[in-house]
């Protein structure tokens, strides 16, 4: 019974015969899938555009810790970031400049030393986008999984790294403010705003089988956590929604509560990414060009969010999954030649 339940909750979209364990296994087809074997039967169509999600379910949503108006103007954003960075003046080098890369790392090491639950340690990870000429772009991933990127025109790789560290440091600092914690008051305010936005009623908020009810359930399950911690969790659900996996789970008769309970305790890992990539391989084989169109759209969204100083993990994970799918397609084409 437990095995069947786990199979139904796998993130693969899955098509093919129903009522068997094989049909409920991860992947994009009812038959076993390998990199060199075309899928059997009609693959799933690309998911429709995602409808608006409740507040705090969007990457870079208002609940994330950016100063008021910071995302509205590049100049205001730069000023806000510099103000936070200057507060770390003890981390100076040369002519009074702040070593933001060092400051960001030290900030998270300090959090760990004070008892923060950092499952993968306090290491801050930087990733440069391959390029032979400016502007250079750098992403930084914080220990919890939140991702930020260089938000300015960066003529050097070192400047891109510093730019990414600045925006990550600002968000890390603001995230420590008490107003960034999920409290009973915050939950009531957020649910009321969601009800108003979607013309819902109070009964919906109390029913975990509705969208707003599920939103409330997620907030209450994460009471006491910060906005960044909550956003890291919601990235998994955003990806499941984007990929069409949530719809597939409903078709497998998974209740909303089952899905929430299962994925609230599952980190985003290579297994989830691989299964979603297989879904996009199947879509591309069914609708040639679907993958390249989605990738182009995702890259635009990622760049816009990066330049606005927003949290980027949802957009970046989408791009990584699509690039993984493109690589798998390339391997399949090479092996068939």
From Swiss-Prot:
Q: Which CDD domains match?
A: DSRM_SF
Q: Where is the composition biased (Pro residues)?
A: 39-55
Instruction: Return the Low complexity bias intervals.
Output: 26-38
| Alphabetized InterPro entries for the sequence | Autophagy-related_EPG5 (IPR051436), LIX1 (IPR029270)
Disordered as annotated region, ranges: 1-55
Where does it sit, as one GO cellular component term?
protein-containing complex
SUPFAM superfamilies on file: dsRNA-binding domain-like (SSF54768)
Query: What Pfam families does UniProt report for this protein, alphabetically?
Result: LIX1 (PF14954)
Name its GO BP terms in alphabetical order: actin cytoskeleton organization; gene expression; mitral valve development
> What family, per the record?
Belongs to the LIX1 family.
What name is this protein filed under? LIX1-like protein
The protein's organism comes out as Mus musculus
């Amino acid at each position: 019974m437990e095995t069947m339940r786990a199979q139904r909750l796998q993130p693969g979209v899955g098509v093919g015969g129903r009522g068997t364990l094989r049909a409920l296994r991860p992947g994009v087809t009812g038959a076993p899938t390998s990199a060199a074997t075309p899928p059997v039967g009609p693959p799933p169509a690309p998911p429709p555009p995602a409808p608006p999600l409740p507040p705090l379910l969007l990457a870079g949503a208002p609940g994330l810790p950016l100063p008021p108006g910071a995302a509205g103007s590049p100049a205001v954003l730069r000023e806000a970031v510099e103000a936070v960075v200057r507060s770390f003046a003890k981390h100076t080098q040369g002519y009074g400049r702040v070593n933001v890369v060092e400051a960001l790392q030290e900030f998270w090491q300090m959090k760990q030393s004070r008892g923060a639950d950092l499952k993968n340690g306090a290491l801050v990870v930087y990733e440069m986008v391959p390029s032979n000429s400016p502007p250079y772009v750098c992403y930084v991933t914080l220990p919890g999984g939140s991702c930020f990127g260089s938000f300015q025109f960066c003529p050097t790789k070192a400047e891109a790294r510093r730019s990414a560290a600045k925006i990550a440091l600002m968000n890390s600092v603001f995230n420590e403010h008490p107003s960034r914690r999920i409290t009973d008051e915050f939950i009531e305010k957020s649910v009321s705003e969601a009800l108003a936005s979607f013309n819902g009623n109070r009964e919906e908020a109390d029913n975990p089988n509705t969208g707003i009810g599920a939103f409330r359930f997620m907030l209450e399950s994460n009471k006491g956590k910060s906005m960044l911690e909550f956003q890291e969790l919601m990235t998994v659900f955003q990806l499941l929604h984007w990929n069409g996996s949530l719809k597939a789970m409903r078709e497998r008769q998974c209740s909303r509560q089952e899905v929430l309970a299962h994925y609230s305790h599952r980190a985003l890992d290579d297994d989830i990414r691989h299964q979603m990539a297989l879904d996009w391989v199947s879509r591309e084989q069914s609708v040639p060009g679907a993958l390249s169109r989605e990738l182009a759209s995702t890259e635009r969204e990622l760049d816009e969010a990066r330049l606005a100083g927003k949290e980027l993990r949802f957009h970046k994970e989408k791009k990584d999954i699509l690039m993984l799918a493109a690589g798998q397609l390339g391997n399949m084409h090479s092996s068939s030649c």
